[in-house]
A protein has these predicted regions:
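A conserved alpha-helical element in kinase catalytic cores
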Residues: 30, 55, 64-107, 115-136
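ATP/Mg2+ or Mg2+-diphosphate-binding catalytic cores
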Residues: 275-299
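Active-site acidic catalytic loop and adjacent metal/ATP-binding pocket
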Residues: 49-61, 69-70, 97, 178-224
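Juxta-kinase regulatory segment immediately upstream of eukaryotic protein kinase catalytic domains
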Residues: 1-46
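A cross-family kinase active-site recognition segment
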Residues: 2-11, 115-171, 217-221
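Active-site Asp-x-Gly
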Residues: 205-252, 256-262, 286-295
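An alpha-helical support segment within catalytic cores of ATP-dependent transferases
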Residues: 25-33, 37, 141-195, 205-207, ...
Length: 299
């Protein structure tokens, strides 16, 4: 079978890591995938499409014919961090890590990739998402190599700085950067976080109804992790007549349901929305940027 990477992966790697690094990894990827499969004695069924934004995911069969998913990511995406987080969670709220191939691939339990929380009505999806993410917030393993929220957001803040002078994004960028400074000055917690938690990152499973996938793990406070979930289905929010009030209610309801400070969640939601918006501007995705900036302006 062909192992051509989905276009979403091609675009995302180029945007995140640069076209040169992406091309150098994607070029030999089909042959590399065959090598990983052969070394692990796995039979490929199909490539998951549209798939993820940082890895190639194949649905496979193990030597005993049991189903699994094989995830192959470039070294610069630090797949060992995902491995360490999944191993620490050991299936609690997240997909279970079954094995690691000699070539660095992650062999994961097979979930239902076609069924995510985005398939549920909004209220039900948010309820299930909150119940899932709370399981992931545990003490990190001793001697871990995960970066902190302060470290990750410092890099992001540096990339946002030029947008202070932008005639349309300048005020929101300044507000987001100020919110970050205040939040990291008084860190609230130091727990293991998913890092990119949203409805699309929670898939249906057999062992449990819903399990998280695709972590970009780091250590810090829960409000940072929840902030990305607040803006889920942003295109629907922006298109609704009561979008602004709905967004603010969502912040309050999620904060209250998970016993966290509303203002810290609001601050991280603002920062993460504006950070994503400025990144979209840099990549030339103006429509995405406008949606994110309008959402951020409501907070």
């Amino acid at each position: 079978m062909a192992f051509e990477p989905p276009q979403r992966l091609v675009r995302a790697l180029g945007e995140t890591y640069g076209d040169t690094a992406a091309t150098e990894w994607l070029g030999p990827l089909p042959e590399h995938a065959r090598t990983v499969l052969d070394h692990a004695s796995l039979d490929a069924e199909r490539v998951m499409a549209p798939g993820g934004r940082s890895s190639l995911v194949l649905l496979v069969r193990r030597p005993d014919d049991s189903p699994a998913a094989l995830k192959i990511a470039p070294p610069f995406a630090r797949p060992e961090l995902e491995r360490d987080a999944l191993a620490h969670w050991n299936g609690w709220g997240a997909v279970r890590l079954l094995d690691e191939t000699p070539d660095g691939g992650l062999l994961l339990e097979r979930l239902h990739p076609e069924v995510s929380l985005r398939s549920l009505p909004e209220a039900k999806a948010l309820l299930e998402a909150a119940g899932t993410v709370r399981k992931l917030w545990v003490e990190p393993p001793a001697g871990h190599g995960f970066e902190s929220v302060a470290e990750r957001t410092q890099r992001q803040a540096a990339a946002m700085e030029p947008y202070r002078a932008d005639p349309t994004a300048g005020d929101l960028t300044a507000a987001a950067l100020a919110a970050r400074e205040e939040l990291v000055a008084a860190p609230d917690e130091s727990l293991l976080l998913h890092g990119c938690f949203r409805q699309g990152k929670v898939l249906g499973g057999d062992r449990a109804p819903w399990l998280a996938v695709g972590p970009e793990p780091l250590v810090g406070e829960r409000a940072y992790d929840l902030a990305r979930l607040v803006r889920d289905r942003v295109e629907d929010l922006v298109g609704a007549s009561a979008g602004a009030s709905t967004a603010r209610r969502r912040v309050n309801k999620l904060a209250d349901s998970l016993d966290m400070d509303r203002e810290r969640l609001r601050g991280w939601t603002l920062f993460r929305a504006v950070e994503s918006g400025t990144r979209a501007l840099t990549a030339g995705r103006r429509q995405d940027a406008e949606l994110l900036m309008e959402f951020a302006s409501w907070l």
